[in-house]
Structures are given as C-alpha cells and as structure tokens.
Amino acid sequence: MENYCILGNPNVGKTSLFNALTGSYEYIGNWSGVTVEKKVGKLKENVGQLIDLPGTYDLSPISKDETVVTDYLLNDSFSGIINIVDASQLKRNVQLTVQLLELNQPIYIGLNMIDVATKRGIKIDYHKLMKKLKTPIFPVVARTGKGTKYLLGEIKHLGEGYQPHFKINYGEKIEETIKNMCQIIMTETSHDKYQARFIAIQFLLNNMQIANELNSEVVNKLSSLRDQVAEQVGAVSVRREMERIRNHYIETLLQDVVTYPDEDKQYFSSRIDKILTHKYIGMPIFLAIMWLIFQTTFTWIGTPLSDQLDAFIGGTFTDSVKTIMNYLGVIPFLQDLITDGIIAGVGSVLVFVPQIVVLFFFISLLEDSGYMARIAVLMDRIMESFGLSGKSFIPMIIGFGCNVPSIMAARSIENEKERLTTILIAPFMSCSARLPVYALFVGIFFKENQSLVVLSLYVLGIIMAFLVSTVLTKTILKNDNAIFIVELPTYRVPSIKTLWRSTWEKAKGFVRKAGTFIFGGSVVIWLLSYVGPHGINVNINQSFLHMVGSFFGMLVQPLGFGTWQAGATLVPGFLAKEVIVSSMAIIYSSGDAGLVNVIQNQFTPLSAYAFMIFILLYIPCVSTVAAIRKETYSWKWTALAVAYPLVTAYVLTFIFYQVGHLFV
C-alpha cells in the first residue's frame, strides 16, 4: 500500500484535510500544537495510507513534535508529500514548501483557506505559481471539504513520471561546498545525489538532527567544509546568507503571483483582539465566558436533560430489565449484580452524558472559533510569574477534556524543563471525568450556585498548577523564562459539521469509558459489597468493601468526609474518576434510602466542597499515569507525579475543612 504524508505549518488545516481525505476523525482546533505525533489513516477509495505529521515551520526541529517530522522524512518510506499551505499567509508558509521541494520527492501543494484569503482581498494566481514551481497545486477548503474530493482522486497519480527538478542557487562559494559535501555523503552513505544535496543544505543550516543521522567520521568531514566556507562568506554566517538567498527567491516567486489589499485595512480579528487580549479586561471576559458555559451546562440545559435521563434509567429502564429477568427466571445473584451493580453503577455515570455533551460543545466552539489561542496569549503574562510561558497553557486547556492528550501536547514545548513541568502540573486541570462528581454534589448542596461552584474548582486547579510550577521551576526544574511566540489564527464562524464531530468524538470517549473502566469497576465494587469474611450476600457493613473503606475513611477523617463509604470510593477513583460516582451509586443505594438522601445525611456543604477539592487534586487516573511514564521515560518522575498531588490534595483539603469548620 502506498504511503503519503501530509505536511505544513501549525494550524493550516492539516488535520482537517486528513479527516476529509480519510473519513476518520482526529482532534482538530483553530490553534497550533494540536497534532504532536504522526497519525495514520486509510485514504478513501483505497488509494493508500495518509500520515498526518505535526505542524512545523522548519525542517530543523526545536521541539519533540517537530523531531517527528524530520525523522519521518529521513528514515521512512513514502510515495509522496502533500504540503498544505495557508493561502492567507502564503509567504510564510512557502518557507517550508521550499525546504520540502529541496527534498526532490514527489509533492502536491494544497492551497488551503482560499476562502479566508478571498475575504481578506488577497488574490492568488495559483496557475502561475504552479508553472513557476513545476508542481501541482490544488485549492481546497479543508474545513468544509471543498476541493478535497478532486485532490483525493489525484493523489493516486502523485509521483507518476516525476523527475527531480528543484534547485535554488546559493551562490558560487556555497554551491561549491554543497558539491563537495554531496561527494562525501554519496561515498560514505547510501543516499543518492538528490538526498545528498538536501542533507548538505540542512547541514549547512545547522540542522542538528541531520548531524545525528550521520556517523561521526562523515560529520567531521562535513564540519570541516562548513568551517571553510564560513571563512569565505565573511562576516555573515553561512546560515544567514543561505536564508537571505532563499527569502529573495520566495519574494521573486510570489511578487507577480499574489496581490494584497490596502495595508492600512484593519482586519476584524485585530479589532476583536484589542478587547479579548486586553491586559485588564481580557481575563474578566474569559471568566465570564466560562461562567456562562457552566451556567448553561449545570442550570439551563445540561442538568434538566440529565434529570430526564436519570428518571428513565432509574425507573423505566431498570423496571423493564427486572421484569425481563423475572420472566426468564434469572437467579437472584445475577439479578442483583445487573440491577444493583451494573445498572446502578454505569447508569449513575451515564446520566451525566447530557452535561458532558453541552460542556464539550462549548469548548469545541471556543477552540474552532480561534478564541482558545488568545487565552494562551492572555495567560502568558500571568504564567511568566510562575516560571512558565503561554505555550504551557495550551496543553493545560486541552486537559479540560482529558489529561492524557494534555500531557502528550506538551511535546510542542521546546524547552525540556518547561515541558516536564507542564507534564507534572497538567493533571490538576479538571478533566471531564471529574465532572460527574462535581455535578452530583453541586446538584445536591449548591443548587442555586452550581455554575459558580464548578467554575471555582476549575480556577482552583489552574491556581494550584501555577503554584506547583513555581516550586518546581525554582527548585528541581530551574529554568529561564522562555519567550512565547504564537500565531494567532483568524477568528471564524465554526461549522456545524465540525462542532458536531468534535463534540461527538469527545462524548463518545466518555461513553466508551462507561462500557469499560466503569463497567468493570462497578462489577468489582458490587462483588466486594456482596462478599465478606463470613460468606456471600452479607450485609454491606460486614463486607470486604466495608473493611477497605473503613481503613481509608479513617485516613481522611480530618478532611471532613471520613465515612467508610467515602473512603471506599477513593480507591477505584485511581482507575477512572467516573468510577467514584458509580461506586457511590452502588454503596449509597444499597439501603432503603436513595442516593441523594444518603449523601445529604453524610455530607454537609462544607465537607462536600472539601471532597470535590480532594477529587480535583489527588492521584491522577491510571491512563494519565501511563501517559506521564511514556512522555518522561522515567519511573522517578512518574512516581513524583503520583505522590505529590496526593500530598497536595490532603494538605489543602485539610486546611480548607478545618479552617472552614471554625466559621460554619
């Protein structure tokens, strides 16, 4: 099967095009840093495989995700490249295009966001550009799918009759050096003359990954030639001279291809940014938007829908299942397991799906509109005080959905110590798995202020992340403040299709977890409540679950929720935070009183908020721990990522409850 790779600058629509060409769905957002590892999909019509590579501005990598690109181009086999460029930012995008053309591999250029360019008054004669580059160009709008069907039909012809042709003349002295380098590379390695020229050019540009691909003897010979030409070039470095020549080539290439409107025209994005990124009013606007989202999620839309679903699962559905099992003569043990264990456990989590969907819809709306990138800029000013840059806030925002992709997104951070710090604080972000816990307790104890209480927990998670990052960056991960440079995407009206797919994929992951982790956890919790030292079908106070819960309940007694029931829910919470709710449903619903009544009797508003603080901050779930181990390559850092949140959660919850108890 033929392999094709898709390449481009960050946030030019690579993943949108990938989804359109493969029919799959990968996470997209109107901001940079979404793709941090290569993703493989099967092209429609069995054309071949398409590999979506992380966005990069240059083939000389400075971050872990950019390393993936250069490594793939040098070491993997592929039939051609699809270079997607932003038509509204063509001059900057062509910088990467030129480097890819120097590979002298079959290439198609996808001219994306042609609609945005047109709205800005930018006119591009892509036919003329195609003739100049001698490379096929396909105008597309990846977000809507316009032009992608034609591109798909042409991909199978990519490389047919291809003859390497692209070459920039870097001047007599540098070209002579490139020629000598090529001879060494072809003699000492298996690369052909075209690959050798690309390697020589990248070596002269100080691409360290290229140097790492060669043996030390070849590197020494090439370094000697580079030093010689550096003396010949004079005061200007070889790299700077080559970049000057390349920039001149690009300007000449585009001068009669692209026509720009009046430069004095101020775009809509710029006018809006003056308000949304304002250093004084930008943050209050962000908090107000988040309050509106939570108000909609927990008061206006989400909760009423959840109540209806809860009534259906706990009433009609459960009664129907009981009737069917009685008719079939199912033994009492299985009946209890299914109704009191599986339906009670899994159902207690599924009732929050409407709230999850509403929340994900609005987060997807903020992402696709381009607003999320502005939040990173806004937070950069604050995060400098805590030893981080705004680039760390991008993975943190992703953590509102799930902490696992949040940790993986830290690959886009160039500075290794800042990347590691971001990984260690990312689990403090309130992921969707914690939301059912919040929803359950705010619905019982804080009915009039549900959105404000949940917002306070999200803000608390961010504050704790900042405080911990301060400690880390001043002690074991000392680091100079990094400069944060980010491209602000154009504001756009999100498409209904994109919003629906994004919301559905996120919600689907939540439901899928209900069918795996939560299902398994519910069965185990119910069995532990069913079995005890004295046999089976024991009173829950004589069960193994009571024994385990009593031990942990004793440990958290100073935190305000030291019952055996609360203690028993904390252990399976390591598996997945949603299991906390399913465990409560099984434990608290085992008696005559309902779940809500029992929680009201065993918690107060103060202890309920203390419990939510503890759930927010304590041990990350097992999937997050696995992601931390994968990204840090260290059991030491993984152990720290498990231990310090537990200590932090205990200390902060203890202080909150004990101080609050003095006033309540």
From Swiss-Prot:
One Gene Ontology term of the molecular function aspect: ferrous iron transmembrane transporter activity
Membrane topology (UniProt): Multi-pass membrane protein
Principal subcellular localisation of the protein: membrane
Annotated residues for binding of GTP 1: 8-15
FeoB-type G domain sequence ranges: 1-161
Binding-site residues for GTP 3, renumbered to this chain: 52-55
Xref: Gene3D superfamilies: 1.10.287.1770, P-loop containing nucleotide triphosphate hydrolases
Listed SUPFAM superfamilies: P-loop containing nucleoside triphosphate hydrolases
Transmembrane regions: 281-301, 342-362, 382-402, 425-445, 452-472, 516-536, 544-564, 567-587, 608-628, 637-657
Keyword entries, A-Z: Cell membrane, GTP-binding, Ion transport, Iron, Iron transport, Membrane, Nucleotide-binding, Transmembrane, Transmembrane helix, Transport
Coiled-coil stretches noted in the UniProt entry, renumbered to this chain: none
One Pfam family of this chain: FeoB_C
Binding of GTP 2, residues: 33-37
PANTHER family for this protein: FE(2+) TRANSPORTER FEOB (PTHR43185:SF1), FERROUS IRON TRANSPORT PROTEIN B (PTHR43185)
Role description: Probable transporter of a GTP-driven Fe(2+) uptake system.
Record-stated family: Belongs to the TRAFAC class TrmE-Era-EngA-EngB-Septin-like GTPase superfamily. FeoB GTPase (TC 9.A.8) family.
NCBIfam families referenced in this protein's UniProt entry, alphabetically: feoB
Protein name per the record: Fe(2+) transporter FeoB
Organism: Staphylococcus aureus (strain N315)
Gene name linked to the record: feoB
